[in-house]
Amino acid sequence: MIQRFRFGLPLPTDSVVQEIPVSAGPVPFLTAEEDGWAYRMAPDAIVYGLGEMPRGINKRGWHYVTNNTDEARHSEDKLSYYGAHNFLLIDGGAGRECFGVFIDFPGKVRYDIGYTEYDALRFATEEPDHELYIITGDDLNDISRQFRQLIGRSYIPPKWAFGLAQSRFGYKTAEDVREVARQYKENDLPLDMICMDIDYMQDYADFTVNKQRFPDLADLSAELKAQGSRLVPIIDAGVRIDPKNPVCAEGLANGSFCTKADGTPFVAAVWPGKAYFPDFLRPEVREWFGRQYKALTDCGIEGFWNDMNEPALFYSPERLKAFFESMDELSRKDNIVQDEFFGKVVGGALGLMNAPADYASFYHDVDGQRVRHDRVHNLYGGNMTRAAGEAFARLRPGRRTLLYSRSSFIGSHRYGGIWLGDNASTWAQLLANIQMMPNVQLCGFLYTGADLCGFSYDTTPDLALRWLEFGLFTPLMRNHATDGSRMQEYYRFADMLPALRKMLRLRYALLPYLYSTFMKAALENTSYFRPLGFDFPADPDAREVQDQLLLGEGVMVAPVYTQNASGRHVYLPEAMKLYRIRSVDDYDTELLPAGHHYVRCALDEVLLFIRPGHAVPVARPASCTAQLDETSLTLWACPDENGSARCRMYTDDGETSDFAAPEHWKVLELN
């Protein structure tokens, strides 16, 4: 059951698609406080949700703020990342209630989940006007399913988007891109996408191409597609200020940009320098901006990634001027003391980026109402995704277009996926990736993944392999790095190359199961990844597991995420069949009873556990998704006590939007 409660006159967010009448009665489970809401937690209560946030699967023990932020340093002390996902799913503990809470609010929401008082959960919206949805059901899976129905079907990408994406900030020429494709082919590594960062643009301006470095983008796109790969370019939120640029000129002429208090366009700097920012909260601006993608779809481009759309702000001219004046004053002093150096020099420079005062200095038009940006800040990136998603439905009707974004809000999951932002090449970030996935998908973002190997810092060969051994299970599987870091395309690691090749081929072999699991989750509002406690709520050990995930109906994964480890502890809430896999053709199996186990897992091995009565269809590996043959399959299985195992498999053309036809489903059974 879903109950809706309205307080004041909340601003629209378009997060919800299901019409729920407003309830007049008291809000169940929660206690109203002066500045928000509270819930008393039992000692064994668990709090899931909040999507893209730091720390573990259980969010208890920290405080958080949903405030979409260009956060380059991912660590446990952070309060916010790139997405605002205001859904909590509370497992009250033994003998207590389970319920979901969705806070539909476009600005900051502050959460204290056992941080101040370990038994107290509190949350408060920055303004009093908001809506609450309280969801109750039979169990955690049922509540999750109801929430997904409330917010609408998750975005479904083309099937080729489940292949490997190779990306880097630093592919500076068309020849760089060709060399990546050539090396993947020569090293017999499967590949489906090469993602281009802002290097391909002219002066870092959206919807432009540098003709000297990329003389014929359409030809490059066609050349790669003939080899089984797609080009996937980046688009940023800020529009470079250049009167000669048609996008800038059009946007100014039709009043498409966010404005300052005096009605003039708001200006801040990002990669191209000074930029304007489209007012994506207006339907006509979304339609206008979405049309601009045609310049690239006409070149044969079938996939995009949207970035810098929190929006990230490097500086505003006003704030930069004030900083320079402050530095000029300091430069005339003979001695700069500690407080001045760290406060004015270091703090002043760092304070230029994403300054709260800048976010409070420009405005949107929301249904004819002038609204200051910081009040609706979390809607911005999601509405850029919406602009693109709606445009692709017009530009490529009946066809699927790949789209994923950095910033998001619940609701934008209907238009595109997300990646988990600018992580780092550390083992801690691998664990963070594992722990973030179920909560992000709980909030509707099914097409999700992290930058494999890590985006910043220099990766190591063993981290590249171990991260791939988890990444081969995630819907978005992209290797991405920043300019200046170690080159980390998989063919670069000569000593690990045989193992990396086998793991990439394993991903493609498992696509019949992974794609079917994704489509089931999208079409039936079930989960792709979920914590063990969802299926085993009465098992206290299962509820506390933070580093194993259930994958669809029949599989559990337990990645190794510590350096130099040759195995790991695994908890099995029921008997399962272990597949210790070195390649599609080289693995050993063992039926393990329920309980605690130490399981050996060499650096070139991955652990896959199949639940009783379930089967996993396995294809022969392929060089790209287009070459995958799903007509001849092997079943990896864990037969039940009757000796049978089954799976539901989904097959379609992977390109069109005809999702619901019943003939796409078939049951494979082993007796």
Region annotations inferred by a language model:
Residues 190-500, 536:
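Aromatic- and carboxylate-enriched substrate-binding clefts and catalytic-loop regions
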Residues 75, 379, 383-401, 407-418, ...:
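Catalytic core of carbohydrate-active enzymes
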Residues 1-161, 168-169, 174, 181-186, ...:
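Catalytic and substrate-binding clefts that recognize carbohydrates or anionic sugar/phosphate headgroups
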Residues 87, 143, 147, 184, ...:
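A residue-level signal for conserved active-site and pocket-lining positions in enzyme catalytic cores
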Residues 33, 41-43, 91, 102-105, ...:
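Glycine-rich, histidine-containing beta strand-loop boundary motifs that form or position
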Residues 82-86, 96-98, 106, 129, ...:
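Extracellular structured ligand-interaction cores
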Residues 64-65, 81-84, 178, 286, ...:
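Short, hydrophobic/amphipathic alpha-helical packing segments
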